[in-house]
């Protein structure tokens, strides 16, 4: 499972800059690779999720296996939530989903 090392949230974009794999390998991603999207396995050890910058899509399996995640507030800017985006989030007890989804 990948773990986020750094991300850039400027200009209303989420850009994943670096992440590690299960094998400890650090990978870099072009900072323009993702435009306001959350991609697979971006975060793995979070408890509460509130987006303060506009995003448009939460990708497939984006928060899969976030076993400590208890609360998610999705902003109105989101129009798509991918398959299995919150699969195996066993502690998730509160989700706020806007009408835009």
Please describe what each predicted stretch is.
Residues 22-64:
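LRR flanking "cap" motifs
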Residues 7, 11-12, 18, 44-56, ...:
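Structural signature of tandem-repeat unit edges
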């Amino acid at each position: 499972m990948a773990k986020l090392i750094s991300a850039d949230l400027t200009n209303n974009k989420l850009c994943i800059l670096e992440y590690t794999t299960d094998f400890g390998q650090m990978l870099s991603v072009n900072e323009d690779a993702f435009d306001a999207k959350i991609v697979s396995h971006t975060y793995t050890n979070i408890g509460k999720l509130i987006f303060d910058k506009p995003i448009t899509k939460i990708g497939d399996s984006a928060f899969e296996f976030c076993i400590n995640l208890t609360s998610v507030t999705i902003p109105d800017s989101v129009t798509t939530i991918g398959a299995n985006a919150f699969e195996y989030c066993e502690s998730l007890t509160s989700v706020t989903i806007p009408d835009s989804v």
